[in-house]
Structures are given as C-alpha cells and as structure tokens.
Amino acid sequence: MIHGLLGRKIGMMQYFTAQGMAIPVTVIAAGPCIVTQIRTPERDGYSAVQLGYEEVEPRKLTKPQQGHLKASGGKMLRYLREFSADDPQAHTPGEVVTVELFRPGQKVDISGTSKGRGFAGVVKRHGFRGGPKTHGQSDRHRAPGSIGAGTTPGRVWKGQRMAGRMGGTRVTIQNLEVVEVLPEQNLLLVKGSVPGARNGLLQIRKAVKG
C-alpha cells in the first residue's frame, strides 16, 4: 500500500457527528493520482513510488518532463511527488490511486505551503511583546529591543529573531484525524485546519507517529 496522496485544499466547514457534536473539518480534494515511476534500491538507492497529480496541457511541461511521463503511461501531469510504500514493486506505472487509500479514524500528516504574510515585524512574526507604551516612550512600541551584547561576543548570534519575510514556507501538521472519506467525489474530510490558502497543493501521508 502507498502511504500518501496529493490533493488540494478546498476550504473549511462544520461537520456534525451522529451524536450531534459539531467539529471543524477541512475539505480536501484528494487524488486521483497516477503512479508515474517506481524507485528501486538497485537503480536509485532507495524504494519509493512516484505519483503524478492534476492533468495539464503538454505545452505547460518541459520536453524532459513530457518524455518522463510518456514513458509511464502518457498522461501529462502537473505535480510529481514521491511516497513510501509497503511494497513499491507491487505497483506499476499507470496505476490509479484514489482517496480510498484512507479510512475514517485514521491519523494523517499533511504538508502544504503556509500563507505568505510578506515582511513582518517581530511582534507579528515572533510574538514579541514590544516596549512600554507610556512614560516618555516614543517610536519604540513594537521594536525588538537589544539584539546582542557588547564587545563579547562582538557580533549578533546566528538565529537571532528579527523582522523579515513571514510565511510562504513548507509546514507539516501531524496526527490529523480523518473524519470521513467520500470516494465518489474524491473528497477527504480532516478534523482541524491544514497549512496554506484555499486551492493550495497538499501532501497527505500516513502518520509517522500515529
């Protein structure tokens, strides 16, 4: 069995359980994905299954990408990602993998690109409390304050938290619970929120710690 799937975030909604409890869920359009390549220890040094997602016009892919996909079934796919599997050799290029890979109650890890926030200050980016608001203080209300000592160490430490670009990075949330699987619509309902904006690409994998 392959341990993951690609999908897109649709949005969030309420889901009512049989007991009438309302829980927040994220709706994900998961798959169908197509197996495009099998990685083997003999040739590649590791075992994995490469999946392709979302058909696209050939002109939007480079010639090497088109050649790679023609060799594995012919469908032109926008995204290619690798996932581990119990037995990669049991799968063949061209095989379709659907959302039925998952089951309600299962724990999954979901990776996506967080929303970009642009250039942000230390209060927003790192949660600094800022300086005093009164007693003659001016222009320093949201400033970081000191960024180091004096002669020793005579420099600013690596990793010092400062203002800068915030968001737009890969984020993984672990152990999210699958609430419902809808194979007819290729939909996956997951409890809680997942990284990124609506329509963002997601990698849904079997939980490492679950």
UniProtKB/Swiss-Prot annotation:
It comes from the Bacteria. One of its GO terms (cellular component) is cytosolic large ribosomal subunit. GO terms for biological process: translation. InterPro entries: Ribosomal_uL3, Ribosomal_uL3_bac/org-type, Ribosomal_uL3_CS, Transl_B-barrel_sf. Gene3D superfamilies: 3.30.160.810, Translation factors (2.40.30.10). One of the primary rRNA binding proteins, it binds directly near the 3'-end of the 23S rRNA, where it nucleates assembly of the 50S subunit. Belongs to the universal ribosomal protein uL3 family. Part of the 50S ribosomal subunit. Forms a cluster with proteins L14 and L19. This is Large ribosomal subunit protein uL3. It comes from Chloroflexus aurantiacus (strain ATCC 29366 / DSM 635 / J-10-fl). The lineage of its organism: Bacteria, Bacillati, Chloroflexota, Chloroflexia, Chloroflexales.
